[in-house]
């Protein structure tokens, strides 16, 4: 158990509440290791998720800075200031590798809560990897609402596990901005 959550069960997140804090720190001096802006580490994260939490449906959620064809993210936890975003085609390569390894066809959704990720280059890179891709082609001036909006989206998904992809997409569009 971590912070009162039995993480050995595939549905451990459903036992969480808004007050649950799950925190794991990287070792000091881990610069250049365990970086979520490293495509191979992202691939290892997918392996970890698929092997430890088998499911009938999968979604992938990204929250960070987007840069269209230049990439997404940039790990800032180690003082490198997020200077190495993952390119769209690098995502595709690692996702396809993991899908082949775990015999998964595609994600139900991929959600980029980030600027500029609705470009044709990103859409092309994620083509066929998901049923629904959420991505904004413009700047998102929602920085102070990121966590609130994401908590609502995840809460809605947890409260409606059988929701179809189009209904979930409609919910996301209707609740993008705070009311």
What function would you assign to each model-found segment?
Residues 1-61, 66, 70-95, 99:
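Divalent cation-coordinating acidic motifs and surrounding scaffolds
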Residues 73-179:
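Terminal, contiguous helix-loop blocks that mediate binding/assembly
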């Amino acid at each position: 158990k971590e912070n009162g959550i039995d993480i050995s069960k595939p549905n451990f997140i459903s036992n969480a509440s808004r007050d649950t804090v799950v925190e794991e720190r990287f070792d000091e001096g881990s610069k250049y290791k365990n970086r979520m802006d490293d495509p191979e580490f992202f691939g290892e994260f997918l392996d970890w998720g698929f092997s430890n939490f088998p499911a009938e449906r999968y979604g992938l959620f990204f929250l960070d800075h987007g840069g269209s064809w230049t990439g997404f993210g940039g790990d800032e936890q180690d003082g490198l200031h997020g200077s190495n975003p993952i390119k769209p085609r690098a995502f595709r390569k690692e996702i396809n590798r993991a899908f082949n390894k775990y015999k998964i066809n595609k994600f139900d959704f991929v959600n980029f809560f980030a600027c500029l990720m609705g470009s044709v280059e990103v859409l092309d890179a994620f083509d066929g990897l998901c049923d629904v891709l959420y991505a904004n082609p413009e700047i998102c001036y929602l920085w102070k609402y990121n966590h609130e909006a994401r908590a609502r989206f995840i809460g809605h998904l947890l409260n409606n596990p059988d929701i179809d992809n189009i209904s979930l997409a409609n919910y996301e569009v209707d609740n993008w901005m705070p009311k």
